[in-house]
Design a protein with these regions (language model features):
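Phosphate/dinucleotide-binding and metal-coordinating scaffold of catalytic cores
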Residues: 1-169
Length: 169
């Protein structure tokens, strides 16, 4: 572990930490100068470095689970593809625009399951809305379930041009 004092605008107590990883490990991950995007995960006890998965790789490794694909559009433009694994409660996204105003999760590139659930709730009628039961009956949904409401309404809201397409994989 290499420990250095931080520079720039960091506090006088600020430090940076670097770890050197053996070449053989990097080669096994398939990381090279052109494909070097990785994810760092910390579970409270372990730091995990892994190659960032593509949507196809994620779909292949989660194919035994209940997997949904949501495509988030602004008008006719596809802005974000979301893969949501309802079995293990994980999410992977790919943004198709650089404008965070039009992406499903704004500037956040690595949403977790709670972020995904919050996003779904934002795209449908609030659970506390008066007349909720009548609304659900009118659209043919038995109980409050954001994903089921979105399947019926495409997550369309009066104040924007965003909408969702949901597919079971």
């Amino acid at each position: 572990m290499i420990i250095n004092k931080s520079g720039g605008t960091a506090s006088s107590q600020g430090k940076t930490y670097r770890v050197t990883i053996p070449n053989s490990w990097i080669e096994q991950l398939g990381i090279d100068e052109e494909n070097r995007e990785v994810e760092l995960c910390f579970d409270g006890a372990n730091i995990i470095v892994r190659k960032k998965q593509t949507l196809q790789e994620y779909q292949n490794t989660h194919k035994q689970n209940k997997l949904l694909q949501l495509k988030f559009y602004h008008g006719d433009t596809l802005c974000t593809t979301i893969l949501a694994d309802e079995t293990d409660k994980s999410v992977l996204i790919e943004n198709h625009t650089d404008n965070p105003l039009y992406t499903a999760f704004g500037v956040q590139d690595d949403p977790d399951w709670q972020d995904y659930c919050d996003f779904l709730e934002e795209r449908c009628i609030p659970k506390s809305r008066a007349g909720l039961h009548e609304y659900l009956t009118a659209i043919g949904v038995a109980e409050y379930s954001p994903i089921e409401i979105i399947r019926k309404t495409q997550g369309r809201m009066a104040e924007d041009q965003a909408w969702l397409e949901v597919t079971e994989l």
